[in-house]
């Protein structure tokens, strides 16, 4: 749209055109009061993206304040591109997770690819070198042709971007449920390493300092992407395909290397990714955080399309772009660094002292807005919250106990469920060994990546059981954090901190806002008990299709520190004769379980309980035993219960089996998803030392016959399956579903 065709300020108000941009009548009146006049079209667009939920967190900010964000190792908490945690030796780990849900629902390949690109930029904008990528994905049932299409193209998009830029995708999780049929979730996490002295901030300070634009040229892709991400999906969403950006990983690789060189220069004052809301958010946020203003001449913005208006340039979300603030008079030093990589660093403005965002175009002022009004003073809403009827119904239900006649068939059936089945089809498309630092590849409890130049490693995981959260958001929130910590501990690492991605429905509905509040309450309590502060994160609301919300899905990305590479532990059993222990007892807890969903076709009842004090104690005991060198393998008991955990321990082993005897109620012992449980194998010579350190029950030993045998305590074998049969079912489930013709 040319400037001549843009509606004038009076038309915007009279025709309520601001509503199409996502602003309410009250918000527009507030803008008028802030400016002391009616906003023009460009200013209305700028306010609309900065006041969207995606950029401002206006509906979630009161809830986010509940998270613990401080800790002895935290160097940077929420509010910057990524959180940063000290790991010793003058090094730190920078990490963050973000969503790209709405774009991936419309254009799955580019939506997923640009989600990866954006989170990488968040990490290297802090001055950190990205060393690993993870993801957390949710889709509907794989029997749906539409879901197959989304799944295949999202995975291809993640692989295409990560593989090209040369950062290993080392881990993640994928779950399938009808709740995500129309609204898939695509959350991408990036982890980087940084020296303390290289940490950068996204600030604009120093009057007269130069604002520089680097990276790809600006086009019309992604305009109003932030607003699009703050709406429910509907039949009309397909028309918003232009709001999905297009990524170029090769450009990003050049930008990454140039930025990491530039951060070594003291000429650089501040740096920020042009992510959601592009040039608008990067300039306004940097100025607001620094306590200054920014003035830009939009005629100088590099453009790849002709006739772009100020509105289009400011709202474009073209990828692979960064905004820099550079000391006045030292622009050439920075420009020379970028020129080495074939990139132009273009001066487009300067820092001012009046706390205003002022934009010039063709010699005229086209926008003049207080930066704080766009950033830290954006509206905040305290939404009404109400416990939903379904929750009260579920809480009142009697305990669900499944009836099982054939234990072999039940275990094979669970191994074939896509949420439990092998994700090899997914991670085989990822280059998870590039840079040669990957110690534990995808498929174990957590990925482990070596920290080059040290004897340490990082354990990385993403976790969230959305079904538990639907049944009981507070308990489910606790479990999400606890399970992430469990996975990290099973890998031989001490949990350090988390990043979170809060994926929920429409917060304007009281029952959805209640889910958000309760989930954050549970997560916060778990973070405090387990000593894992929240250092970064993202909120993705309005994940609904035609009024149907996804399950509450607050994904936890956790980083743990392995302080000695010899402590790295994996889930497969290691050798015949080793003793098998289970830590933790089973209760009849099947609400939200894989077994319930498979047998009944739906979930209901109460989620499993979690005692955080017990959880913390068991994790401490297990980590102490691992560090003492008396644990051969460790695996947490999660979806599918103990039977699935044992199957996974033998499937991953080479030529080994297991013979175990379980006591008590067999259905609960084998298939309940009771929390705070682990399967551990121990060499016989370490039996006494292990039993002194850990409260655990000896249930059997590893065999060399490639058969999983499970006996009841009163005699009688209830499960006897060859490892090959289990492996074939487990590995073949997802490829078979993708090949099937509906």
Curated annotation (Swiss-Prot):
Chemical reaction(s) catalysed: N(2)-formyl-N(1)-(5-phospho-beta-D-ribosyl)glycinamide + L-glutamine + ATP + H2O = 2-formamido-N(1)-(5-O-phospho-beta-D-ribosyl)acetamidine + L-glutamate + ADP + phosphate + H(+)
EC number: 6.3.5.3
GO MF annotation list: ATP binding; magnesium ion binding; phosphoribosylformylglycinamidine synthase activity
Residue positions binding substrate: 99-102, 121, 245, 317-319, 540
GO cellular component, as recorded: cytoplasm
CDD domains: PurL_repeat1 (cd02203), PurL_repeat2 (cd02204)
Ligand binding (Mg(2+) 2): 122, 273
Residues involved in Mg(2+) 1 binding: 98, 538
InterPro entries reported in the protein's UniProt record: PRibForGlyAmidine_synth_PurL (IPR010074), PurL_linker (IPR041609), PurM-like_C_dom (IPR010918), PurM-like_C_sf (IPR036676), PurM-like_N (IPR016188), PurM-like_N_sf (IPR036921)
Gene Ontology annotations of biological process type: 'de novo' IMP biosynthetic process
Pfam families referenced in this protein's UniProt entry, alphabetically: AIRS, AIRS_C, FGAR-AT_linker
PANTHER family: PHOSPHORIBOSYLFORMYLGLYCINAMIDINE SYNTHASE SUBUNIT PURL
Similarity section: Belongs to the FGAMS family.
Its job: Part of the phosphoribosylformylglycinamidine synthase complex involved in the purines biosynthetic pathway. Catalyzes the ATP-dependent conversion of formylglycinamide ribonucleotide (FGAR) and glutamine to yield formylglycinamidine ribonucleotide (FGAM) and glutamate. The FGAM synthase complex is composed of three subunits. PurQ produces an ammonia molecule by converting glutamine to glutamate. PurL transfers the ammonia molecule to FGAR to form FGAM in an ATP-dependent manner.
Name of the protein described by the UniProt record: Phosphoribosylformylglycinamidine synthase subunit PurL
Originating organism: Geobacillus thermodenitrificans (strain NG80-2)
